[in-house]
Structures are given as structure tokens and as C-alpha cells.
Amino acid sequence: MNRKSKMYIAVPAEILGIILPLLLGVAFLVLAERKVMAFVQRRKGPDVVGSFGLLQPLADGLKLILKEPISPSSANFSLFRMAPVATFMLSLVAWAVVPFDYGMVLSDLNIGLLYLFAISSLGVYGIIIAGWSSNSKYAFLGALRSAAQMVSYEVSIGLILITVLICVGSCNLSEIVMAQKQIWFGIPLFPVLVMFFISCLAETNRAPFDLPEAEAELVAGYNVEYSSMGFALFFLGEYANMILMSGLCTLLFLGGWLPILDLPIFKKIPGSIWFSIKVIFFLFLYIWVRAAFPRYRYDQLMGLGWKVFLPLSLAWVVSVSGVLVTFQWLP
């Protein structure tokens, strides 16, 4: 087998090696969320389909696949169908630059951090197109809310990424992880980590910032007119973005695949396992926040983004760069 033939086999295999575990992770993340929320609310949660409800994601998936796809008569059909596919594809494409272990990455770009930021910014287009093409006032209002919310919090996320970038001197995600061998950035930059995680909640439209799909006022928001696989793709995209943002928190602040302590017994555990454990920790925080906190008002959400996080993240950029220059610690 020549080199070209090997490449045609290896590249799709690597892509499937990322997509299939991600889809499985999304399926069982939904189950985990329902179980954790049930525990918080002192009830059982799903436990009928399979042992301990383990087959519940399969039943939910089959239900959505077998439903009839209904489109509004006044909708723009091509854009209406394209929007959920675009949203889901963007959530998958972002994983190309995420390193699970040293060397275990599909494409180790030198601008990996910038690439992830660009992909997360493009996600708003799928939502805007979905709201506009549905030709429904509720869907369009939800889409406008989502666009305003995502753009607002992308500003503070960008400044936080600059703070980490100043500490490392590189946009390569593998180099950012290796720079945390002595100390994780989450320890000296703990307030930045908290701001970044809260901004990720707003960026992924998760509670308590799920204003775009506020059921009480917007009847589920931008995806109100979607059924069957259209709704399922938006759903999968949201949860895939949750896992992606948890992975980004892990890479930037918790040392990625590096073990918790620099001990021989911990070094025997594969880096991908450490990475997964840290991602699961952030996913648990996502679920816990949803179960524990009420939804913000829209003006409170915007005020938090522009009046609190923007000046704070800007102040951290200035203070971190000042400390590094003063003590000659610049990379």
C-alpha cells in the first residue's frame, strides 16, 4: 500500500476516532445531567430503559429520528434545513486542534487557540439563520438574544485568552499545556478561571444564562419551529460545545493531560485519562450550576458581561503583563 492510500485511510480513521467518542459522550452527558439534577431534586431520574437507565439516550435518539420533520409553510426551506447542520458541524470541526495527550491531536496548529476562538464566533451564524429562516417572531427574538449574548461574552473570553497567551507566548495548545508543568495557570489566575467558566456558560447558552431559549417567554427560543433531526442537531451541537468549552478550560487552566501531582504513580496513568477526568469535572460544574441557580434577567446578563467582566478581564491583561515585564518573566 503506497503512502497516498495510507493517508486516505488514516485521515478518516482519525476523524472518526474523534467524532464517535464525542457523540457517545454527548449521549451519556444528557443522561448524566438528568441523573445529577434528579439527585439534587431528591428524585430517581431515568431508570426504566435498561439497567439504571443506561439505554435512555438510545431511546431518546430513536424517538427524535423517527419523528416527522415538519417545516413552517412560510419558512425559507434551504436555510431552515442548513442552520442545524452548520451549527452541529462547527461544534465538531473545533475538535481538530484539541490535544488529548502529548502528540494525540488531529492537527497541532501554531494558531490553535485563535482557530478555536474563530470557530466559536462562527457558531452564532447558525443560530441567527435558524431564527430568521423560521419566519417566526419567537424564533427570531430568541436568535437575536443569542447573538447579542454570544458577542457580548466573546469580548471577555478573547481578553482572557490574551492573558493566558501573554504567560506562554504561543497560541499552540500543546505548548500552553507544557508551560503548566511547574504550576497550573488556574492557581495564580484563579479569578480569571472563574470569569472564563462563567463566560463559557453564557457562550454556550447554558443555565443560568439560557435566555435565548427561555421557555416561559420565548417558547424554547430560536429552535421552536424545529422537530425531528433538526432539533436533535441543535441539541447535539449545544452539548458538544459544552464538552469543547470544558476541554478548553482544562487546557488553559488545569494543565490539560498533565497529572494532578508530579508523582511516579500518577505518571503511570495515561494523559488522555487525566484530560477526561478534568473535563468531566467541568461538565459536572455545568450541570450543578443549572440545578442550583435561577435564570438571570436579560438586562442583568448584559450588565454582567459589559460592566463587570469586560473591565475585570481588561484589568487582568494589564496587571499580568505588568508583573511579567517587572520581574522579567516574559516567555
Swiss-Prot record:
Superkingdom in the source lineage: Eukaryota
Transmembrane feature ranges: 11-31, 85-105, 111-131, 157-177, 183-203, 243-263, 269-289, 308-328
Membrane topology: Multi-pass membrane protein
Molecular function as annotated in GO: NADH dehydrogenase (ubiquinone) activity
Biological process, per Gene Ontology: aerobic respiration
InterPro entries: NADH_UbQ_OxRdtase_su1/FPO (IPR001694), NADH_UbQ_OxRdtase_su1_CS (IPR018086)
Keywords assigned by UniProt, alphabetized: Electron transport, Membrane, Mitochondrion, Mitochondrion inner membrane, NAD, Respiratory chain, Translocase, Transmembrane, Transmembrane helix, Transport, Ubiquinone
Catalytic activity: a ubiquinone + NADH + 5 H(+)(in) = a ubiquinol + NAD(+) + 4 H(+)(out)
Assigned EC number: 7.1.1.2
UniProt-annotated location(s): Mitochondrion inner membrane
GO cellular component: a single term: mitochondrial inner membrane
Enzyme class: translocase
PROSITE patterns named in the record: COMPLEX1_ND1_1 (PS00667), COMPLEX1_ND1_2 (PS00668)
Coiled coil segments of this chain: none
Pfam family, one: NADHdh
HAMAP family: NDH1_NuoH
Family: Belongs to the complex I subunit 1 family.
Further remark: Exons b and c and d and e are cis-spliced, while trans-splicing reactions are required to link exons a and b and c and d.
Biological role stated in the UniProt entry: Core subunit of the mitochondrial membrane respiratory chain NADH dehydrogenase (Complex I) that is believed to belong to the minimal assembly required for catalysis. Complex I functions in the transfer of electrons from NADH to the respiratory chain. The immediate electron acceptor for the enzyme is believed to be ubiquinone.
Annotated protein name in UniProt: NADH-ubiquinone oxidoreductase chain 1
Gene: ND1
